[in-house]
Every structure is written in C-alpha cells, then in structure tokens.
C-alpha cells in the first residue's frame, strides 16, 4: 500500500513529497503552509531561510492570542519566527526539488500548488514529579504533504 495524498494531481506536470511523523508544532506548520502556498519553490526557500534568520516573520492568522505584533507583515499584525518547523519545511522543499529534478522539471520555477500539515498522533512522554508520580508530557507528530506544478506560461 502506497502513501496517499489528500489531493489528486497529474503526475505528468507535478512533483510531490511528504514529511512523515515529525515532532513539529501543527499550529506553526499551518501558518507556514498558508504563507508559502502559491509561491515558487525558490521564493519559498528564500522566505523560510529569512524566517530562520529572524529577518521575516510568519503571520499567525489563527491561534494568535498572545502573539506579538511584527512590523514586517503587510496587512496583518501578529507573527512569530517558528524556527524548528521552518527547518523541516526547508527539508521538505529540498526533497520536492530533488523529486522534480528527477522527473525532468526545473524545480526552482515550479509553483507550490498544495501544502497541508496533518496531525498524525502523539509521541508518548513522561515528566517526573514529586512523591514518585509522573505527568504525561506528549509531543504532537505531524505529516506535511506538498505538491508542486509547472507554471503555465501566459502569452499576451
């Protein structure tokens, strides 16, 4: 049984990749996915590297209570620099670029058509407490899928 994606795409004009069971925040992943969707692969890589370097922030349009305001976001105020999730998204973009190159496409010019994070479970953990007790301390696991397609040239 193969890996299933949440969208059906034409394999002749697209490439896809997936991160499996990564210990990253689902909320951060959703915010990053919303921001890079529709961008070219090269632009998305540049953006994520700027997020890691804390030069540009990711707008948090959901789950944003208590999130500080950033002045580099146009049309929005709340944002953060989710470094851990951004590094995993860079790995995902590198993977989909390699898949696109293998299929004969120019990877950096392809457009991100679909990117979706999904919660797939929790990694069980325990945190020791006083008197020999322990509290569960679980980590969320996420899958992230991405599909890139060729840009269609518009002739005027």
Swiss-Prot record:
PROSITE patterns the UniProt entry points to: RIBOSOMAL_L22 (PS00464)
PANTHER family reported for this sequence: 60S RIBOSOMAL PROTEIN L17
UniProt similarity note: Belongs to the universal ribosomal protein uL22 family.
Subunit note: Part of the 50S ribosomal subunit.
Cystine residue pairs: none
General function of this protein: This protein binds specifically to 23S rRNA. It makes multiple contacts with different domains of the 23S rRNA in the assembled 50S subunit and ribosome.
SUPFAM superfamilies referenced in this protein's UniProt entry, alphabetically: Ribosomal protein L22
Keywords: Ribonucleoprotein, Ribosomal protein, RNA-binding, rRNA-binding
Protein name: Large ribosomal subunit protein uL22
Pfam families in the record: Ribosomal_L22 (PF00237)
GO biological process: cytoplasmic translation
Cellular component annotations (GO), alphabetically ordered: cytosolic large ribosomal subunit
Organism per entry: Halobacterium salinarum (strain ATCC 700922 / JCM 11081 / NRC-1) (Halobacterium halobium)
GO molecular function (one): rRNA binding
């Amino acid at each position: 049984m193969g890996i299933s994606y949440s969208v059906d795409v034409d394999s002749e004009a697209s490439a896809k990749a997936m991160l499996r069971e990564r210990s990253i925040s689902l909320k951060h992943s959703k915010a990053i996915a919303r921001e890079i969707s529709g961008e070219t692969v090269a632009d998305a890589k540049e953006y994520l590297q700027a997020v890691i370097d804390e030069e540009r922030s990711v707008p948090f349009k959901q789950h944003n209570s208590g999130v500080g305001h950033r002045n580099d976001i146009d049309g929005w105020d709340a944002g953060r620099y989710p470094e851990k999730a951004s590094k995993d998204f860079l790995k995902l973009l590198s993977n989909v670029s390699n898949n696109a190159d293998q299929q004969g496409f120019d990877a950096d010019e392809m457009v991100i058509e679909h990117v979706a994070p999904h919660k797939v479970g929790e990694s069980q953990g325990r945190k020791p407490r006083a008197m020999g007790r322990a509290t569960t301390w679980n980590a969320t696991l996420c899958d992230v899928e991405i599909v890139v397609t060729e840009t269609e040239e518009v002739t005027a």
